[in-house]
Amino acid sequence: DWLTATEFLLKQSRKRQEELKTTLVNGGAADYTQYQHLIGEIKGLNFIENEIIGLHKRMETADEE
C-alpha cells in the first residue's frame, strides 16, 4: 500500500542523507565542486522527505473524512 511504499522511501532517504553527512564530516569532498554536489543531494533528499511527510498528513486527513 501507499504507506508502506512511502515509509520505505523515507527510510532510504534518511539513510542516504546520513551517508552523505558522514562523507562531509570526514572530509570526503575532494574539492568545492564535489562539496556542492553533496550538499545539493542532501537538499534534494530533504525536499523529497518533506513532501512525503506532507503527503502522509494529507492522506491521514482524507482517511478521517
PLM segments and residue spans:
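N-terminal acidic leader/helix
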Residues: 1-27
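Short, charge-rich amphipathic interface segments used for partner binding and complex assembly
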Residues: 29-60
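Short intrinsically disordered terminal tails
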Residues: 1, 59-65
